[in-house]
Amino acid sequence: NLLEEETKMKKNSLQELGWALGVMLLPVLYAVWVYETLPENLSIHFDLSGKGNAFLPKFLVVSAFPIVMMLLEVMIYWTTIAKDILNRTFKHLIRWIFPFTFVSLYLATIYRGLNEEFDIRKTAAMVVALVFIIVGNYLPKKVQADRELINRKWAYLFVLLGFITFIVSIFYL
């Protein structure tokens, strides 16, 4: 019975991985659709003023970059299967935060290639703020069998930094 339950959990994990990879493919379809209108080189890194300071050919951004990100997602899934995570909600959060972060930042990168006036800093800051808030929410909880609880003050600090970053990104960027 324990073997059946473990097999079912792995099957569910593989289905969830398939959904996550599918979500990660959606912005790639958009990038393929607008491929001809993209500039030859796309910014993949930006300085604090929002200007691109590292570039890749659009072919690599549209094709190779998503493949690398999907491989990282597979590694995240493998890690959450191999390592015993006690909190199921946290396990799903770890599995889905990367695809949604990728989708947000990838779409922002593609849109920035189409519109130089688009301020990518706002999108990046909002994603970082949400990650801080989520991590702060789960820091004080015991999520792995072999780990100790982390002091709640760190969790409060992460949540506070997340809210401040989010407010700054909305009103000041």
Model features per residue range: what roles?
Residues 10-42, 47-49, 55-173:
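Feature 926 captures the class I aminoacyl-tRNA synthetase adenylation module centered on the KMSKS loop
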